[in-house]
Swiss-Prot record:
GO terms for cellular component: plasma membrane. It is a peripheral membrane protein. It is found in: Cell inner membrane. Belongs to the ABC transporter superfamily. Lipoprotein translocase (TC 3.A.1.125) family. Part of the ABC transporter complex LolCDE involved in the translocation of mature outer membrane-directed lipoproteins, from the inner membrane to the periplasmic chaperone, LolA. Responsible for the formation of the LolA-lipoprotein complex in an ATP-dependent manner. One of its GO terms (molecular function) is ATP binding. Keywords: ATP-binding, Cell inner membrane, Cell membrane, Membrane, Nucleotide-binding, Translocase, Transport. Its EC number is 7.6.2.-. PANTHER family: IMPORT ATP-BINDING PROTEIN (PTHR24220), LIPOPROTEIN-RELEASING SYSTEM ATP-BINDING PROTEIN LOLD (PTHR24220:SF689). The keyword ATP-binding applies. The complex is composed of two ATP-binding proteins (LolD) and two transmembrane proteins (LolC and LolE). GO terms for biological process: lipoprotein localization to outer membrane; protein localization to outer membrane. This is Lipoprotein-releasing system ATP-binding protein LolD.
Amino acid sequence: MNEIRETLVQTPKKATAVIRAEALAKTYAEGKMRTPVFDGLDLSVATGETVAIVGASGAGKSTLLHLLGGLDIPTSGEVYVAGERMSALSDAQRGKLRNQALGFVYQFHHLLPEFTALENVMMPVLLSGEDVAVAKSQALQLLESVGLGHRVEHKPSELSGGERQRCAVARALVNKPGCVLGDEPTGNLDDKTAGTVFELMLELNRAQRTSLVLVTHDRGLARRLDRVLELHQGKLRELAPSAV
């Protein structure tokens, strides 16, 4: 992150917050119609913390995740990632910060079909400017840790659904990001495989102190995280364990 910090605008930050949203608002416009998703939303995620975001379909959970990851631009308000104010950055700077400070895991793995598991996991390291030898070493280490050491030369089409998602988790973590954002990362898997992938993410969270922010409809999985936040009518509210 040192190289990034030399070129990006410095902003005040809470020392323990890896991601912070302040007065976040998002409204979609189509012609004269305005559809507000949320307004005045605040959120802070500490280093190593695990947070579940739950809510009804269409509540804006994925939109919130995209805003936190700098994949979408808020109508108003600010998002800080690793202390950097996202709105102050160019597209190139945001992309560089995302690659080094964040990891993403989706319901669909989004692995590149023409590349092997190893090559897919190497990609973020190469994009950060490291040479092939470093990228290969880091990718092999992560693939081994997720139980795919024997499948590194296989392409996504040759992997099972659970193996593809484990490969996606390895890719998300290979640059040792401060936070991983997951949008229903186990949603396409059967219960047993989903549990395995979820356990893997928690193990890597503990080992690397990587924060997790997971959008999920599975209240059982959500209860196992440090905090559960419900997005309801444009507001975030923390749920008591008994209410999850």
